[in-house]
Amino acid sequence: TTGVQNTLIGGLAGDAITDADFNIAVGYGSLSANTLGSKSVAIGRDALSNQNYTTATDAFNTAVGDLAGGAVTTGIKNTLIGGLAADRLTDADFNTAIGYGTLSTDTLGSKSTAIGAFALEAQNFTTATDSNNTAVGYLAGGAVTTGIRNTLIGGASGDALTDADYNVAVGSHSLSSDTLGSKSTALGYTALFSQNFTTATDSFNVAVGYEAGVSVTTGTGNTLIGGLAGDAINVGLNNVAVGYLALSGETGGQDSVAIGTQALKTQSFSSGTRPSNIGIGLNAGLSITTGINNTITGTFAGDALTDADDNIVYGTLALSSDTLGSKSTAIGVAALQTQNFTTATNTHNTAVGYNAGYAVTTGTSNTLIGALSGDALTDGNNNVAIGEGALGAETRGDRSVAIGNATLSVQNNTTDVDANNTAVGHAAGQAITTGISNTLIGGFAGTHGTDLTTGTQNLCLGYNVGVSANDAANQIAIGSGFSAGGNNTASFGFGSVLLTIGLDGSDTSWAASSDERLKTNVATSTAGLSFINDLRPITYEWKQRKDVPSDMTRFYEEGSTENCLGSGTTHHGFLAQEVKTVIDSHSEVKEGCNIWSQHSDGTQQLANGNFVPMLVKAMQELSAKNDALEARIATLE
């Protein structure tokens, strides 16, 4: 009647339009029921043939194809292109259907996009529903009935889904077997191809890449990214595989992480097994089959391990030769690179640092921390090396401890031997080759003067203290900057030997430095008989700890009947407090006296050996008196 700018071509085309504008109808019966709907395009036999608005409405519907949108009544803003495209839609809006038979069952579903022959063909909402489904490709989402918010792109992608929601499938035949699984993401040719949940299940699977997760059936919570990543998993759960062929042999295991090309490639466990392996890096953990609880990070790290457990590996080529060794820790490039146990073994080896423990083959229970530490060890056991190059030449020796850069750096036993050397401090024992049972503590300990090389059972304690010969035995040197006096001796000093004690069990006296060339202001002492006569020698027993004054915290222990010092027998000696009083009353002794001293906690102490000069002086005085008396007696006779 009053409609304007309508183009109507074909028998009965737009024959009911009254006051509607800007419509195009081309084809027999197209737009034939419309009265007041405007701005529609209907091209094809009976296209939009039932559209009809009882009030003036801008429909913005477009239907192109035989019977396209033929059932639309009051739906708006639909784009329907293709024979039978959305031909049953009635009061639905904002749909796009392009391709033969697309969206051809739905009646009241809105906001769907179906592009490709038979895409979303079976979708059908009988109540008004915003489906928000997107299907692009031949048969994409072809079986979806009432599922919502699915995005399916690719030929036959998601084509078996029915009442499933929130899935994303991109790639030919991706997610194409599942019916009721929701919240899956499959990107790539046949990604998640076999997944199929027959009851409503939130799978939370993600597969991205050619045939990624292609065999997953009912496994859930898997993240598989990369060509053929996790492609054998069927019922496995909560796995992460990122990289070409990552975790590609796994079937039923759960909770593994494989990141990197071929990481954990051959791992395979039956349903319900929790291997909890982590492989990160090119070929990381490549050969693991049934090993569990391994953490492997780095290119080729742990790539020969098979049925080994509880290993920690960080670094390129770290632990890269071992097959059956378990409970190793290798952190650093090439750490424990050549370790290899061909039978199941708990190695308990720890190597941290560049090339640390590089050459270990079958040695066990070694702790090697520091670049190049213990890097020549092969089958040595129970060694500890901490510091750059520590124990760096040893091959087969056992039970050495080297702490500090270059400590025991040239020690090397070519046969199995308990070396039992301990070196702590920068370069301590750095010259020892085959010496055993030495203890060297302090920077450069064992290197002063003549280097200790093949000696045994020596103790050097202090900076730059040493022994008297390369093959020294049973020498003790404590102090700094000097060498011990000889075998079976203990020497103490700072810069030179101040005291040497024999250690061979014979009646050997203490020897202290007394060279006149070291002394000045020499004078004859007058401290003698008078001082000695004022001393009171006593006998005594040590108190039990409970009886000591409680403020003497080094010795007091409530309720303890243990003697505070020594045994409970009678001893001979002095009381320090009385000796201090005598010293203070003798000016000839008071200056320079080192007989009496006081500990920081207030405990008074005596150095009994320092009475000797006074005793000698007293004897000299008595001897002089005796000589005088004998001379007098002789004159009287």
Q: Which residues are covered by each model-predicted region?
A:
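Intramolecular chaperone/auto-protease modules of tailspike-like proteins
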Residues: 512-637
